[in-house]
Amino acid sequence: DSLEAYEVDDTGWRKLDVPHDWAIEGPFRIDLDGYTGKLPWQGIGWYRKHFEVSSKDKKKRFYLDFDGTMANAEVWLNGKKVGGRPFGYSSFRVDLTPYVLYGTDNVVAVRLDTEKFGSRWYPGAGIYRHVRLVKTEPVHVAHWGVFVTTPEITDTYATASVHVEIENNRQYAVKGQYTVDIYELDANDNISKKVASTAKRPVFLDAGTSVTDSVSLRVESPKRWNLEHTYRYLACVSVFDKNKLTDVYDTPFGFRTILFTHDNGFLLNGKRVQIQGTCNHHDLGALGAAMNKVALERQLRILKSFGCNALRTSHNPPAPELLELADKMGLLVMDELFDCWTVGKKKNDYSTLFDKWHEKDIETLVCRDRNHPSVIMWSTGNEVHEQYEPAKGIARHLAEVVHRFDHTR
């Protein structure tokens, strides 16, 4: 079970593409829990990936972004541990830069352990969501480092407030700059016309630090996102180091207002919408938990044909593709975090992680998903036992953590 070493001979290993769910292959076993499909999802699995990095890229930064790994992920590069995440539904980033080998073979090893992960439904097993290798300049937009809010929306104009976090990974201070351009997006994610832009804005970054700045842009005659017409825009942030373009970071968003009222229910853009939703687990039935965007879109089209207009991501963070589809197809989303808090429902469930990880897992979900117009609310839990002990203050605490990263919902 020590397969992270660089020199491990993996030539005889099975070759496959991720996303991958090893458990859906079966076989079914009568002795296993029916709640998790009587499938052999509990076990330990290893993945290894070889890749080369050009010697020309020695001054670049390299990251691996995982959308989800089931579960208790540990990640190594060339035998050196670079990070991981225990919660199988959380996205996370690891920094590969210190251990990258240039001009020769690099090996990423990922160990997953679902034996120490409890679930009340079928979770799948493996690297079941997408992984991306990210290469950047030392001065770049931080991970999920753009937050677009829309404080003013009228028929005549709208205001987009763009909050940008820029990182400086150099060993010296940098006088940087950034610009923001806003474009219309069509249904196929193609950029249409530019509708707003800024001049270059200066930012001073000390060595090894990040800086957050914000700018407001006025968009004339905004097209509002709604369930019938899913108009979207793109905020394009360009970062400069000594007038050299070092990063371009795109963030889709939409103009829309949401309001819950005591006498007229939910209002989208000032108009009442009867929420008709379903609670959706992340698996794709017989296809398992491995992300398949076409299969997921099929599920959503079937639900819409029934009259469904809303989704609850029961009971965990969804794949990013779900929210992308909800934005495009016109669905409202309750974006959910946890099935339990400090009191568990199954052995080795999230209650064993709550104290150490809940704030980080909240930050991850909210920062990743807060720009989606389809997301109308955050859910911090499902049928939690602590609801009978409000004096503990956990619900209030979780709401406060959410609002650190999103004050708009």
PLM region spans:
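Active-site mouth of glycoside hydrolases
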Residues: 86-102, 116, 121, 172, ...
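Short, hydrophobic beta-strand segments
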Residues: 96-98, 214-225
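Accessory beta-strand-rich segments of carbohydrate-active enzymes
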Residues: 37, 42-149, 169-170, 317-320, ...
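Accessory carbohydrate-binding/adhesion or oligomerization-edge regions at the termini
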Residues: 1-30, 107-113, 118, 127, ...
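Extracellular recognition modules
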Residues: 109-111, 234-238
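Solvent-exposed, conformationally flexible loop/turn segments
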Residues: 44, 103, 157, 205-210
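Beta-strand-rich binding/interaction modules
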Residues: 77, 158-203, 213
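Short beta-strand edge segments in extracellular beta-sheet folds
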Residues: 134, 252-256
